[in-house]
């Protein structure tokens, strides 16, 4: 189990700290440190659970950055730098931090929200509304046609980078319906034989990505104006630049390539 969620830390276990300074996360030797920066004032300290045998804590730096070993990195570069085993811990901390910062007042009556002692949610002492960390489900689909994969790029992607199709689930919509809708809207293609692959919590800012592989079922590629800059079919031995290795898109594309090669063997 990646996370255990007791109410109190286990005193016999070591610690891991996610200390933020604005949009920056503090790392030591490219890892989440075992203790916060020495001699620094912290705010928002919170126990987030047990992850990989360590008590996980969240805090924000108050004042200037400490002049000591380590570096402050934006979240994406920090996730790339740290061991894969710690990525999920940092993602949890980033998502909960965003929730704590954005849910300070009741959206119903504007009363300051109270922190719950036994859960991560916050409640309104005036009207009784309860707020929990937001999770936004989104699907990702990799469309296969023989040994070719349909990859696309959005205008905000790094130059030369392509990825699988993705989009948020609409209210009242199933994941499967979202896959069919997004592939049609984004590239004008129909799909069939959907297969669930895996999922990933993605803290930009609070997505839960659910990845699928689907087979091509017709249609000519027609990139959606304003959303898709380019799209095309790519042979698995001639892929363009791909998303960073920690992303579910990278894992999904590599997984599909491996499956195709296994079938060809």
Swiss-Prot record:
Binding site for a divalent metal cation 2: 182
Role description: mRNA decapping enzyme that specifically removes the nicotinamide adenine dinucleotide (NAD) cap from a subset of mRNAs by hydrolyzing the diphosphate linkage to produce nicotinamide mononucleotide (NMN) and 5' monophosphate mRNA. The NAD-cap is present at the 5'-end of some mRNAs and stabilizes RNA against 5'-processing. Has preference for mRNAs with a 5'-end purine. Catalyzes the hydrolysis of a broad range of dinucleotide pyrophosphates.
Cofactor(s) needed by this chain: Mg(2+); Mn(2+); Zn(2+)
Disulfide bonds: none
Broad enzyme group: hydrolase
Originating gene: nudC
Record-listed E.C. numbers: 3.6.1.-, 3.6.1.22
Protein name: NAD-capped RNA hydrolase NudC
Positions annotated to bind a divalent metal cation 1: 166, 186, 227
Originating organism: Chromobacterium violaceum (strain ATCC 12472 / DSM 30191 / JCM 1249 / CCUG 213 / NBRC 12614 / NCIMB 9131 / NCTC 9757 / MK)
Record's keyword terms, sorted: Hydrolase, Magnesium, Manganese, Metal-binding, NAD, Zinc
Gene3D superfamilies: 3.90.79.20, Nucleoside Triphosphate Pyrophosphohydrolase
Catalysed reaction equations from the record: a 5'-end NAD(+)-phospho-ribonucleoside in mRNA + H2O = a 5'-end phospho-adenosine-phospho-ribonucleoside in mRNA + beta-nicotinamide D-ribonucleotide + 2 H(+); NAD(+) + H2O = beta-nicotinamide D-ribonucleotide + AMP + 2 H(+); NADH + H2O = reduced beta-nicotinamide D-ribonucleotide + AMP + 2 H(+)
KW Manganese (keyword) present: yes
Record-listed substrate binding positions: 76, 132, 200-207, 249
Cofactor note: Divalent metal cations. Mg(2+) or Mn(2+). Binds 1 zinc ion per subunit.
GO MF annotation terms: magnesium ion binding; manganese ion binding; NAD+ diphosphatase activity; NADH pyrophosphatase activity; RNA NAD-cap (NMN-forming) hydrolase activity; zinc ion binding
The family this protein is said to belong to: Belongs to the Nudix hydrolase family. NudC subfamily.
């Amino acid at each position: 189990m990646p996370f255990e969620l007791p109410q109190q830390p286990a005193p016999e276990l070591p610690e891991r700290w996610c200390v933020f300074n604005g949009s920056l996360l503090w790392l030591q030797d490219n890892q989440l440190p075992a203790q916060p920066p020495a001699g620094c004032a912290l705010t928002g300290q919170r126990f987030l659970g047990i992850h990989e045998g360590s008590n996980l804590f969240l805090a924000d730096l108050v004042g200037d950055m400490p002049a000591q070993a380590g570096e402050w990195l934006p979240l994406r570069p920090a996730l790339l730098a740290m061991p894969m085993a710690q990525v999920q811990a940092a993602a949890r901390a980033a998502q909960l931090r965003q929730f704590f910062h954005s849910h300070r007042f009741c959206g119903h009556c504007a009363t300051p929200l109270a922190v719950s002692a036994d859960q991560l949610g916050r409640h309104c002492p005036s009207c009784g509304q309860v707020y929990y960390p937001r999770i936004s489900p989104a699907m990702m689909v990799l469309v296969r046609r023989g040994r070719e994969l349909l990859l696309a790029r959005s205008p905000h992607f790094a130059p030369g980078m392509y990825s699988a199709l993705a989009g948020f689930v609409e209210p009242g919509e199933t994941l499967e319906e979202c896959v069919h809708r997004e592939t049609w809207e984004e590239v004008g293609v129909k799909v069939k034989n959907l297969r669930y692959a895996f999922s990933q919590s993605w803290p930009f800012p609070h997505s839960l990505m659910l990845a699928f592989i689907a087979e091509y079922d017709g249609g000519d590629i027609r990139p959606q104006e304003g959303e898709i800059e380019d799209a095309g079919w790519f042979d698995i031995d001639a892929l363009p630049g791909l998303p960073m290795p920690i992303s579910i898109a990278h894992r999904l594309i590599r997984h599909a390539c491996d499956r195709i090669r296994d079938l060809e063997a």
